Amino acid sequence: MATQVEPLLPAGAPLLQAEEHGLARKKPAPDAQAESGPGDGGGEPDGGVRRPRPACARPGRDGAERESPRPPAAAEAPAGSDGEDGGRRDFVEAPPPKVNPWTKHAPPPAAVNGQPPPEPSAPAKVVRAAAPKPRKGSKVGDFGDAVNWPTPGEIAHKSVQPQSHKPQPARKLPPKKDMKEQEKGDGSDSKESPKTKSDESGEEKNGDEDCQRGGQKKKGSKHKWVPLQIDMKPEVPREKLASRPTRPQEPRHTPAVRGEMKGSEPATYMPVSVAPPTPAWQPETKVEPAWHDQDETSSVKSDGAGGARASFRGRGRGRGRGRGRGRGGTRTHFDYQFGYRKFDGTEGPRTHKYMNNITYYFDNVSSNEIYSMDQELLKDYIKRQIEYYFSVDNLERDFFLRRKMDADGFLPITLIASFHRVQALTTDISLIFAALKDSKVVEMVEEKVRRREEPEKWPLPGPPIVDYSQTDFSQLLNCPEFVPRQHYQKETESAPGSPRAVTPVPTKTEEVSNLKTLPKGLSASLPDLDSESWIEVKKRPRPSPARPKKPEEPRFSHPTALPQQLPSQQLMSKDQDEQEELDFLFDEEMEQMDGRKNTFTAWSEEDSDYEIDDRDVNKILIVTQTPPYMRRHPGGDRTGNHTSRAKMSAELAKVINDGLFYYEQDLWTEKFEPEYSQIKQEVENFKKVNMISREQFDTLTPEPPVDPNQEVPPGPPRFQQVPTDALANKLFGAPEPSTIARSLPTTVPESPNYRNARTPRTPRTPQLKDSSQTPRFYPVVKEGRTLDAKMPRKRKTRHSSNPPLESHVGWVMDSREHRPRTASISSSPSEGTPAVGSYGCTPQSLPKFQHPSHELLKENGFTQHVYHKYRRRCLNERKRLGIGQSQEMNTLFRFWSFFLRDHFNKKMYEEFKQLALEDAKEGYRYGLECLFRYYSYGLEKKFRLDIFKDFQEETVKDYEAGQLYGLEKFWAFLKYSKAKNLDIDPKLQEYLGKFRRLEDFRVDPPMGEEGNHKRHPVVAGGSGEGRKRCPSQSSSRPATGISQPPTTPTGQATREDAKWTSQHSDTLTLRK
């Protein structure tokens, strides 16, 4: 065996040199020799055996590789000390070889190359017998240390050598006891243990101490082993690749466990690695999976002893801990363990494959690249995918697909190709065509696909294709946004919707009956049906505005239905009835109709009517009482004329307010209806036309028999049925659906409501509430009370020594915009209508209009001004006379306070606030008080969060400045406002906590002021606006003088007088 080992050693020498990492391979040869020596019983003299010890010297390069194999044997010994002893008993013959000759042979690595001659020497056995046992014991201790000490571990791994070859079986016999001990750790150690024992017997006995002593010297010999490993690299990595996948499977990372399993782990790997000399390296690489975990630890241990290669060698034979794990240099690749077990990083092509897979996106990579399949297979996939789309199971659930089908069940092939799953297969339309060409489930026609069996069964009738044209058009006409008033009118009326739905359906039960039935209650698209229902509800005022639309709309939406009714008298009678209703409603119920409109448009009012844009602001005409005698004298005295002005009663104010409404309507009517005068004249003639002969009447109204369809309405209208269909339509702004005559109210030309309803083009009037709710005139109502000098009162300018003089003010909305001219403030005429005349800074008398209030306004000295020019004049006067000295400026403050409540304009508000605060800083608080009144009443009417924040901010500032008026207005707002869950400033809440009643806001008048309050005819109109708070406020106080607006009797009286303006009347209430 020794001779065989020697030739192996020389042959292995180059191999070992080729793979420095696989020193274990060469080492197995020397180990085999050493082991064979002991097995043969002679070999001690054999220098070759000791040259295998030089092989130990080679492991000695690692520093402890040789020792590591011995420790495995020793490991077996540690498994049982008796094992070591038994080993020694077996090797008792070896003691003579313990002589240093082993060490002598170990140092010369060249002797290893010349192993063939020395191998026959028998002393090798002797050496193994004597030296290995003591060495084993020592190495056992070393292994114990190695478990905790990385350096010995490295030595062990480096000493690992899969040199055990065929001679191993003989070796196995003597160390079977050790093997058993190892088998206890690992069942596979039986084969490896003898090998290691034999190796340890020869090499360890002779060179254990030497290897430990001269480990570094042996490292020098390692370099020779490096080239040996080079030869092994190509074979090892390949096998390693296969083995790597298994490496992660074996969890042997804990060095302590390895120490415990020293014998067992190497035993499992050693047999595999030891079996074939050259193949042994490969198997060892395969065994590396288990070593894999140990490799990591061994790498740490072996770092000091020759790097990864040394660690491999040490593992090759060392059974203690990573004996054959890293064999074949596999450990060098452990960096890639976590990534690719097969060292894919080393192989370029494999890396490319992974790259492709990682960056794969079907939209960016062609299907051919992704799916490496032939065209036929790809076509089959495409066909199956699309056939699935058209399968019964899918169509029963896929409503999207069915809605996309046309009447014949076809779907565009482009739609199918756009599905993601099809795109993942291919984006080539031609390929899809080719794939579906021979399909038995679907068929292709031009560029469309459908199911072969019962294709027409699946399409779902969708609105997109057929219904869109009809439903789109009808829905537009029917939707409340398009015809808002009509929809709500019908529903708001006392259940007219149900009769409508019943009555019109039978009349229109033809092909469009379904469509008509649905929109009847919602739209004007079915005016005829609605007209019948309206006949029943003739008295309803709302139908009138919508009905004119109805006759037109049906012509577009349901032309077929109209012709059917046109020949019948129903249509005409319906139209006639509707027209008559319109006339009847316009007579007096237009007020209600307007009121309903306003109620209906309440939401829109909040958005539009309560706000006004800058262009509309430029259309405002201010109506003020500004003759020279009304001007304030330098000394602050007023002429007696103010008394007559202040005495204006609520009735007179109401008349003037109505007059301003009429005036505004005239402005708008004359602009948009230049023929209005002619129509009005004809309307005046309607009264005379009533005298028409019966023949003429029948000619003009060929279908008076409205009774069959409209039994109730015909009575009243007959009295005034006249041939004025065209004129009536013009007057009422309604289209002329037919030439049917309508009766017109005799008072139409004088009815403000009539004109109000007939001026839909007015930007504000049609949206505003009636005159009682949206006043045009803000009068100052006089209080006949005298001031009690000693009575507590509110701290306000009206109670000051020099109270401001408040003036009546009104406004109208002109039909034309009067843009401000910055060049001058002269009285140059503006763009106003001829009726209005020129509006300049110079007051202009009101033009004559058909209303008694005209004379009242004229007699009381009211003049009109373009708003922006009047504002300019006020600002100039304020600048000229000084802050707080301009009566016109105070009138402008008062106007803003009232106007902004119903017609908010951001720019106007900001200017109002700025000027009021500027005046307050100078000690003139009238503008600020007007601002607080606007805050309190305006927010109560239309809450705006940003304004509410300003209200809180200014209230805090006002209170901290020692004033109570702002806090009182805020307190009143919180009490009477409907707004809930308001976020109030904590500081303001603290201030409010001091005031529980309205009386708490009254303070004793300052000394010297009592005599100055003889005359307080003017009461800030903005302060009281008839708010219902007055009762509670007034009730809290007894009657007081003028200086105390909160008094009960006076406050209530003024409220009653101011009912005409509801919130806008200038009443004396506690709010003031």
Swiss-Prot record:
<feature type="modified residue" description="Phosphoserine">
    <location>
        <position position="568"/>
    </location>
</feature>
<feature type="modified residue" description="Phosphoserine">
    <location>
        <position position="608"/>
    </location>
</feature>
<feature type="compositionally biased region" description="Low complexity">
    <location>
        <begin position="562"/>
        <end position="571"/>
    </location>
</feature>
<feature type="modified residue" description="Phosphotyrosine">
    <location>
        <position position="754"/>
    </location>
</feature>
<dbReference type="GO" id="GO:0045070">
    <property type="term" value="P:positive regulation of viral genome replication"/>
</dbReference>
<feature type="modified residue" description="Phosphoserine">
    <location>
        <position position="201"/>
    </location>
</feature>
<feature type="compositionally biased region" description="Basic and acidic residues">
    <location>
        <begin position="59"/>
        <end position="69"/>
    </location>
</feature>
<feature type="compositionally biased region" description="Low complexity">
    <location>
        <begin position="122"/>
        <end position="132"/>
    </location>
</feature>
<dbReference type="GO" id="GO:0005737">
    <property type="term" value="C:cytoplasm"/>
</dbReference>
<dbReference type="GO" id="GO:0016239">
    <property type="term" value="P:positive regulation of macroautophagy"/>
</dbReference>
<feature type="modified residue" description="Phosphoserine">
    <location>
        <position position="68"/>
    </location>
</feature>
<feature type="modified residue" description="Phosphoserine">
    <location>
        <position position="824"/>
    </location>
</feature>
<feature type="modified residue" description="Phosphoserine">
    <location>
        <position position="198"/>
    </location>
</feature>
<feature type="region of interest" description="Disordered">
    <location>
        <begin position="737"/>
        <end position="773"/>
    </location>
</feature>
<feature type="modified residue" description="N6-acetyllysine">
    <location>
        <position position="869"/>
    </location>
</feature>
<feature type="modified residue" description="Phosphoserine">
    <location>
        <position position="1065"/>
    </location>
</feature>
<feature type="cross-link" description="Glycyl lysine isopeptide (Lys-Gly) (interchain with G-Cter in SUMO2)">
    <location>
        <position position="286"/>
    </location>
</feature>
<dbReference type="GO" id="GO:0031931">
    <property type="term" value="C:TORC1 complex"/>
</dbReference>
<feature type="modified residue" description="Phosphothreonine">
    <location>
        <position position="503"/>
    </location>
</feature>
<feature type="region of interest" description="Disordered">
    <location>
        <begin position="1"/>
        <end position="268"/>
    </location>
</feature>
<dbReference type="GO" id="GO:0031929">
    <property type="term" value="P:TOR signaling"/>
</dbReference>
<feature type="modified residue" description="Phosphothreonine">
    <location>
        <position position="746"/>
    </location>
</feature>
<feature type="compositionally biased region" description="Polar residues">
    <location>
        <begin position="1060"/>
        <end position="1072"/>
    </location>
</feature>
<feature type="modified residue" description="Phosphothreonine">
    <location>
        <position position="701"/>
    </location>
</feature>
<feature type="modified residue" description="Phosphothreonine">
    <location>
        <position position="842"/>
    </location>
</feature>
<feature type="region of interest" description="Required for interaction with RPTOR and for repression of mRNAs with a 5'TOP motif">
    <location>
        <begin position="551"/>
        <end position="1072"/>
    </location>
</feature>
<dbReference type="GO" id="GO:0003730">
    <property type="term" value="F:mRNA 3'-UTR binding"/>
</dbReference>
<feature type="compositionally biased region" description="Basic and acidic residues">
    <location>
        <begin position="175"/>
        <end position="212"/>
    </location>
</feature>
<feature type="modified residue" description="N-acetylalanine">
    <location>
        <position position="2"/>
    </location>
</feature>
<keyword id="KW-0597">Phosphoprotein</keyword>
<protein>
    <recommendedName>
        <fullName>La-related protein 1</fullName>
    </recommendedName>
</protein>
<feature type="region of interest" description="Disordered">
    <location>
        <begin position="790"/>
        <end position="837"/>
    </location>
</feature>
<keyword id="KW-0832">Ubl conjugation</keyword>
<dbReference type="Pfam" id="PF21071">
    <property type="entry name" value="LARP1_HEAT"/>
</dbReference>
<dbReference type="GO" id="GO:0072752">
    <property type="term" value="P:cellular response to rapamycin"/>
</dbReference>
<keyword id="KW-0810">Translation regulation</keyword>
<feature type="modified residue" description="Phosphothreonine">
    <location>
        <position position="626"/>
    </location>
</feature>
<feature type="domain" description="HTH La-type RNA-binding">
    <location>
        <begin position="372"/>
        <end position="462"/>
    </location>
</feature>
<feature type="modified residue" description="Phosphoserine">
    <location>
        <position position="830"/>
    </location>
</feature>
<feature type="modified residue" description="Phosphothreonine">
    <location>
        <position position="765"/>
    </location>
</feature>
<feature type="modified residue" description="Phosphothreonine">
    <location>
        <position position="774"/>
    </location>
</feature>
<dbReference type="GO" id="GO:0000339">
    <property type="term" value="F:RNA cap binding"/>
</dbReference>
